Amino acid sequence: MILIVIGLVLALNSFRQAGIILSVAILSIGLSFLGLFIGQQNYGFIGTIAPTGLIGLSINDSIIVLSHIKEEAEKKLISKAELIEVVIRATRHIITTSLTTLGGFAPLIFASVFFRPLAWAMSIGVLGATMTALLYIPAMFIILKKIKH
């Protein structure tokens, strides 16, 4: 985890932006437990693997959204309307990743008894992490940059 933090700070040149991404990663851990609860699955060793995978996926989604926002913000002063357009453009990449992940875990939900907790935790967690990246990252960017109307 320390290497992830160091890598994010070096890549983004910002402790605040790395903190935003890491907060999404921490939220994804809770989303994996929500997936276990919704799927009525027991928490065991297989269920322990899901938060680790979700952390990676949520960091990936967050980096994509934040890089699109930073790219646009470096060109000019960005308004809230322009920020929404940037996030909409980034949505395609994130949705593609999330749908392929869900498609991969769908057979495990229905066919596998052993991997069912992992599949439930990852599937619900991926949906939540995607929504978190698309909504939370822009909101935190607005707060940090103090963007007006």
PLM segments and residue spans:
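N-terminal membrane-entry
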Residues: 1-2
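Membrane-interface catalytic loops of GT-C/OST-like multi-pass glycosylation enzymes that act
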Residues: 112-117
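Structured binding elements
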Residues: 118, 123
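Membrane-proximal cytoplasmic C-terminal regulatory module of class A 7TM GPCRs
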Residues: 143-149
